[in-house]
Regions:
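Extracytoplasmic
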Residues: 63-68, 121-295, 299, 544-690, 722
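Juxtamembrane segments of multi-pass membrane proteins
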Residues: 450-578
Length: 846
């Protein structure tokens, strides 16, 4: 439909022929089939694995410039997301340990977990030394490397004798030790001492991981999930298993407490909260809208038809969103529940025309009457939602798709389905309501419309400007993702007991080969070590190169030993014999060195194959991009603070293949960039709405001295001045433009910091709020329109929308809360100012 068709729609007097009963039934059956197909598809999707997404990371866009780094972030999140940690605590040491064993056995028996580790299997630390023993001549601790490299040629034998004597006569050391015959100088033992095995407060007692803090004893239980932490089936199984096991535990050990942490608990909490909100918002919106429509229309039949149109929109929106995206995020589901108030607007406008026609009702003529207003309203709403499609946030794209399909389906059902269902004239009409609304509109229009609109605009701008100057922003992503406080407290308790901080920052190291990754990681390790003793130092860090040095480093260590130690085998053998080693022991050690020269260096695959490496395997991400054969690893520092983070970021920028990742900071930065861009998008969208409404409401060209309805064919038209051509579009756009400005001013005066979601909500204020002035102006363009009925429809539409989005403003999800509050405030102002868009009495015919 083009603009000329829209402009001429209200002048069309020709009444189309009535549809036959067969045509009516064909339309009804077609819509019924559409509804059945959409409903059956949704039922099929929800009958299998749940398509609901509870992963908060799914809300976020890619933030890393390097796609390999982005994939590394996802891989690490997936690896850590399937772990669940439980902490059993009591002031009675025996109770804590017994309770942990009972809880571990109960959870393992439940089948809800892939594995549960409470009691550690007997483990000999010699297994760790056994892995490295064949490669010991390429593994030197930094202190030994420095001693060998820094010694003068003549002093090397003296250094070796001192090292050998210290090794022989030093007291026995705990931890990882090596046999004297296999490691006479202690090089491997010192290298093993540098492994980051004990980076927590945990100790092994009675085959349990135990932490002591004051009088409390805490025992750690680690479990893995059989599926994704974000699958509803997994969440429910874990929840049920824990509830049953903890109930039995409280009966046996009343003094024991259990803290938990893991992605599955946050995901389950988010899903449950979202389901509660969907029910609350959906039921409250339905009940509120039903009461409003019954109060105004006094017709259960109209109420039912309105909800039929709305239900069609929501079911089709749900089906299309699942079809396009494959998944449905909880944020989209909650927003979809609030779409009820907007989707029912189109039905309300149709019902107002229906009741206003009284005995002269013709269903198809009624559809033609409301078509121009609904089409303009649909286009402005689609414009607001279409802008969300351009934002690279998956959840916002889902919301935009859901809303666009929903309101388009509701629009189509009003024009084609309702005329087939609403064929009989109304038995009664709420004329008293319409008359009261007409008087209210006349009073309010005299107060703010006509010539006074300019003064109202100037006054609002004068009041708003100081508020704009007080506007602030806060793009911190943590303010937009609400986590269950109880779960956060339990996570903090686990971290405090274990002794690991809450740092979510890490380095991603990439390379074209595993060797390149290891070399880049070693360069990073050197730089991190260099920060010790400075203001920018970090605590301990974990790096895969602490377990597997690069082949280059191992070759250099071999070369150093060959130059400084094994350059004179006879002298070395004599040194060993003088220290008391037997001939066969010295010969065996020298032979082992000779054999080691022919074997390849230690590789990552060999280390990964060792069972004891399991707790550290997340440090090696392996091949993250098969197309480019890119490999990656992570280096995780402890003690990252706002003070030293800039130094770490600068360090990563200096090193090849190294990226410092702070997902929260990256997303916050991206939020800020798009928040700034949103202001330009809003201005551009406002300009497009102005153009659209100007094309719709520009007066026609008429011959000089003729009224518009007096135009005979063949007369040359008179040019309409530019000001007059723009007047209608400006007047209709002005209410929503002022609504946006007033909303921003209120946030400024209230010192509420703005974020991206506030600005995106203003886009929808523009798209939805413009409808009210459009509905009023379209009513003025219809000669037979009852403006009281039109104003009733506008107020009812605004009330239903405010009800839905007002409920959204009470959401526990901060993103939706700011979204809904902004929408509700903007729409309230837009409907109050809508009469500004009405033409004066002298121009109504134009």
């Amino acid at each position: 439909m083009n603009m000329r068709d829209l402009r001429d729609g209200h002048d069309t007097q020709k009444v189309p022929p009535r549809r036959s009963a067969r045509q009516m039934w064909a339309v009804r059956v077609a819509w019924l089939l559409l509804a059945l197909v959409a409903a059956l598809y949704c039922a099929w999707r929800f009958a299998g694995p749940s398509p609901l997404q509870t992963d908060l990371l799914a809300l976020l866009p890619a933030t890393e410039a390097d796609p390999v780094a982005e994939k590394a972030v996802d891989t690490l999140a997936s690896a850590l997301g399937d772990r669940t940690v439980l902490l059993v605590t009591s002031n009675d040491d025996a109770h804590a340990k017994a309770a942990a064993k009972q809880l571990g056995a109960s959870l393992q028996k439940s089948g809800a977990f892939g594995s549960v580790t409470a009691e550690l299997p007997p483990f000999d630390l010699a297994q760790i030394a056994a892995l490295y023993m064949p490669y010991r001549f390429g593994l030197l601790a930094p202190v030994d490397r420095a001693a060998l490299a820094g010694g003068a040629t003549g002093s090397s034998s003296t250094t070796l004798r001192d090292t050998l004597a210290q090794r022989i006569y030093s007291p026995l050391n705990g931890g990882l030790t090596t046999p004297l015959a296999d490691d006479p100088f202690g090089w491997l033992q010192r290298w093993l001492g540098g492994l980051p095995l004990a980076t927590s407060n945990l100790e092994v007692e009675d085959n349990l991981l135990v932490a002591h803090r004051g009088a409390a004893t805490s025992v750690l239980i680690v479990a893995t999930l059989p599926g994704s932490a974000y699958e509803t089936k997994t969440q429910r199984a874990v929840h049920a298993a824990l509830a049953q096991s903890e109930s039995a535990l409280r009966q046996a050990f009343p003094d024991v407490s259990v803290a938990r942490t893991g992605a599955v608990f946050y995901a389950e909490s988010a899903r449950s909260a979202a389901e509660r909100e969907v029910h609350l918002i959906g039921v409250a919106s339905l009940c509120g809208i039903a009461l409003l429509m019954l109060w105004v229309f006094r017709s259960p039949r109209l109420l039912l038809l309105g909800f039929v149109s709305t239900a069609l929109g929501i079911v089709c929106a749900l089906a299309v969103t699942l079809l396009v995206f494959g998944k449905l995020h909880l944020l989209t589901l909650v927003f979809g529940a609030s779409l009820i108030g907007e989707a029912v607007d189109y039905s309300i406008q149709y019902f107002v025309v229906y009741l206003g026609a009284q005995r002269d009702w013709d269903a198809r003529r009624g559809a033609r009457t409301v078509r121009p207003a609904l089409t303009v309203a649909l286009l402005t709403s689609l414009l607001g939602y279409a802008i969300l499609m351009w934002v690279p946030f998956p959840a916002l794209r889902q919301i935009a798709c859901f809303a666009m399909v929903g309101i388009t389906t509701a629009f189509a059902s009003v024009l084609w389905l309702l005329p087939a269902l609403l064929t009989r004239a109304p038995k009664r009409s709420p004329q008293r309501v319409f008359l009261g609304a007409a008087r209210l509109l006349a009073l309010w229009r005299r107060a703010i419309g006509g010539r006074r609109a300019a003064y109202v605009t100037a006054l609002l701008l004068l009041v708003a400007i100081p508020g704009w100057l007080r506007l602030t922003s806060d793009d911190d992503i943590h303010l937009l993702i609400q986590r269950d406080p109880s779960l956060v407290a339990q996570e903090d308790k686990v971290r405090d007991a274990v002794g690991v901080d809450n740092s979510a920052q890490f380095f991603v190291v990439r390379g074209d080969t595993p060797e390149a990754v290891l070399q880049h990681a070693e360069a990073l390790d050197v730089q991190l070590d260099a920060l010790d003793g400075t203001a920018n130092q970090v605590g301990a860090y974990q790096s895969v190169t602490q377990f597997v040095p690069s082949a280059k480093q191992q070759s250099e260590d071999r070369a150093l030993l060959a130059k400084r130690v094994f350059d004179n085998p006879a002298a070395l053998r004599a040194t060993l014999l003088q220290a008391g080693f037997k001939d066969q022991v010295a010969d065996a050690w020298l032979a082992a060195y000779a054999q080691a020269q022919a074997q390849p260096p230690l590789g990552v695959e060999r280390w990964l194959a060792a069972p004891w490496s399991q707790p550290y395997r997340h440090l090696w991400l392996g091949e993250v991009d098969s197309a480019t054969h890119a490999y990656a690893a992570v280096v995780i520092p402890q003690g990252v603070t706002p003070r030293n983070e800039p130094a770490l970021l600068a360090l990563a920028q200096r090193l090849p293949g190294v990226t410092f990742v702070d997902k929260a900071a990256s997303v916050s930065k991206l939020f800020g960039a798009y928040r700034v861009d949103s202001g330009w998008w809003l201005g551009g969208a406002l300009a497009l709405v102005l153009v659209l409404l100007t094309m719709r409401y520009a007066p026609k060209e008429v011959p000089l001295g003729r009224a518009p309805k007096e135009v005979p064919s063949g007369h040359a038209p008179q040019k309409v001045p530019l000001r007059n051509r723009l007047r209608g579009g400006i007047a209709t756009t002005l209410p929503v433009a002022l609504a946006v400005g007033v909303t921003l001013a209120i946030f400024g005066y209230a010192r509420v910091p703005l974020n991206l979601f506030n600005w995106l909500a203003l886009m929808l204020v523009l798209g939805v709020g413009a409808n009210y002035a459009v509905f009023l102006r379209e009513g003025c363009l219809r000669a037979d329109a009852d403006l009281g009925a039109v104003w009733t429809g506008v107020l009812l539409s605004a009330a239903t929308t405010l009800l839905s989005f007002g409920m959204l403003g009470m959401s526990a999800m901060p993103a939706l809360k700011s979204f809904g509050a902004t929408l509700a405030l903007g729409i309230a102002v837009a409907v109050l100012l809508a009469p500004i868009g009405m033409p004066s009495e002298s121009r109504r015919a134009a």
